[in-house]
């Protein structure tokens, strides 16, 4: 045997080992890549939203034929709902969430989808926070307007009963020393504050007022005269009225640069801006989920409180529903109430019995989307899908 034959023979012996090593490296690399991809999909709700859109928007004309269209829909639905890692309740919640978003107005649909809620409860919390953001300025505006209307109603009847302007009485000043003393005596009664308050508001509307000695003075002179200690209560009430009117006139001074919405208080603007920035400073200590408002965190904590109601006394495991606790306790007690009518085998859970009965009926509900092969157990399908993964690498 010549040298070339020996080299070929030696290569023939070494090639399978090198090929096996290369194949192992490829399988490990792809497994790591799939693990990273699945981790990204689990941690990123936006990925599930993309799969949902593809699932809903797939056109028959985009596929080569009916089988390919059905297979593609199965793949997208599988990636969207993730039945291998999601419970029935979670899948049901996703379907309800989709229908809930579809009945919302289009403007709210887009806004809620941008925040990528993972459940219907999260979508409701987002909408409730948004409603509170929108209602706060309107509520304050209504309160100010109500105070303004009450103030005007008190001013109008008093102005009709006691005219004090020069036009109504140009030549005969009515405010004498006797009348001033009378007013002073009235001021000692329980109604003094209310009467003086109305006179003060009325005088603000009058350009000039008659003084006891017939001297005319304007609003500035009146304000100086109110500095007298005997009129302290009137001046204090006047300041309070001016502050209320100042708040009304200054309404909307805090404006959002993004959408132009105005708020009376800076705290309202700060809460509103979190909608645009996506900031969520309130974080749950249990699961790490964050919220833009404290009310959202408060409502979310109720979920954890509900989830921790049912404790197993044997091992300390926690369940959100009593049925889950009852099923779990059968493990400790050894109870197997579900019995197969074919072979009399017993199981602690009904799902185990259903899975066992497929061995008698021949039912295979778990189908591979790659080749169409069916299996009676989901674990067998997962084991089978590894064959396709290795084939793709080769």
Swiss-Prot record:
Biological-process GO terms, alphabetical: regulation of transcription by RNA polymerase II
Keywords: DNA-binding, Isopeptide bond, Metal-binding, Nucleus, Repeat, Transcription, Transcription regulation, Ubl conjugation, Zinc, Zinc-finger
Gene3D superfamilies in the record: Classic Zinc Finger, DNA breaking-rejoining enzymes
Keyword Transcription regulation on entry: yes
Pfam families (alphabetical): SCAN, zf-C2H2
A single cellular component GO annotation: nucleus
Cross-link (Glycyl lysine isopeptide (Lys-Gly) (interchain with G-Cter in SUMO2)) at residue(s): 26, 215, 238
Principal location: nucleus
Zinc finger (C2H2-type): 254-276, 282-304, 310-332, 338-360, 366-388
MF annotations from Gene Ontology: DNA-binding transcription factor activity, RNA polymerase II-specific; RNA polymerase II cis-regulatory region sequence-specific DNA binding; sequence-specific double-stranded DNA binding; zinc ion binding
Cellular compartment(s): Nucleus
UniProt-listed PROSITE patterns: SCAN_BOX, ZINC_FINGER_C2H2_1, ZINC_FINGER_C2H2_2
SCAN box domain span: 52-134
Role this protein plays: May be involved in transcriptional regulation.
Family listed: Belongs to the krueppel C2H2-type zinc-finger protein family.
Name under which the protein is recorded: Zinc finger and SCAN domain-containing protein 9
Native organism: Homo sapiens (Human)
Lineage, broadest ranks: Eukaryota, Metazoa, Chordata, Craniata, Vertebrata
This protein's encoding gene: ZSCAN9
């Amino acid at each position: 045997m010549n040298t070339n034959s020996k080299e070929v023979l030696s290569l023939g012996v070494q090639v399978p080992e090198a090929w096996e090593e290369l194949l192992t490296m490829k399988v490990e690399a792809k497994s790591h890549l799939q693990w990273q991809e699945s981790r990204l999909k689990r941690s990123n709700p936006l990925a599930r939203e993309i799969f949902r859109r593809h699932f809903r928007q797939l056109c028959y004309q985009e596929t080569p034929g009916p089988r390919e269209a059905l297979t593609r829909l199965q793949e997208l639905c599988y990636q969207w709902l993730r039945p291998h890692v999601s419970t029935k309740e979670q899948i049901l919640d996703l379907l309800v969430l989709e229908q809930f978003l579809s009945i919302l107005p289009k403007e709210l649909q887009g806004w809620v989808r941008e925040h990528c809620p993972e459940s219907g409860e999260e979508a409701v919390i987002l909408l409730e926070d948004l409603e509170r953001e929108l209602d706060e300025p309107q509520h304050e505006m209504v309160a100010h307007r109500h105070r303004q209307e009450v103030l005007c109603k008190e001013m109008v009847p008093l102005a009709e009963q006691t005219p004090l302007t020069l036009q109504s009485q140009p030549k005969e000043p009515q405010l004498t020393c006797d009348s001033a003393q009378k007013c002073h005596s009235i001021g000692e009664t329980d109604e003094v504050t209310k009467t003086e308050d109305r006179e003060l508001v009325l005088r603000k509307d009058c350009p000039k007022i008659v003084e006891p000695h017939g001297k005319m003075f304007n609003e500035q002179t009146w304000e100086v005269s109110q500095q007298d200690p005997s009129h302290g209560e009137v001046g204090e009430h006047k300041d309070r009225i001016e502050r209320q009117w100042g708040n009304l006139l200054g309404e909307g001074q805090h404006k959002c640069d993004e959408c132009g919405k105005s708020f009376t208080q800076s705290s309202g603007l700060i809460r509103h801006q979190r909608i645009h920035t996506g900031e969520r400073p309130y974080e749950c200590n249990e699961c790490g989920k964050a919220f833009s408002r404290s009310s959202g965190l408060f409502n979310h904590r109720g979920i954890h409180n509900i989830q921790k109601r049912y404790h197993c006394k044997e091992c300390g495991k926690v369940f959100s529903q009593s049925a889950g606790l009852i099923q779990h306790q059968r493990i400790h007690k050894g109870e197997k109430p579900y019995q197969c009518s074919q072979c009399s085998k017993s199981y602690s859970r009904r799902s185990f019995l259903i899975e066992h009965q497929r061995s008698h009926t021949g039912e295979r509900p778990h189908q591979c989307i790659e080749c169409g092969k069916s299996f009676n157990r989901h674990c067998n399908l997962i084991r089978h899908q590894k064959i396709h993964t290795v084939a793709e690498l080769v």
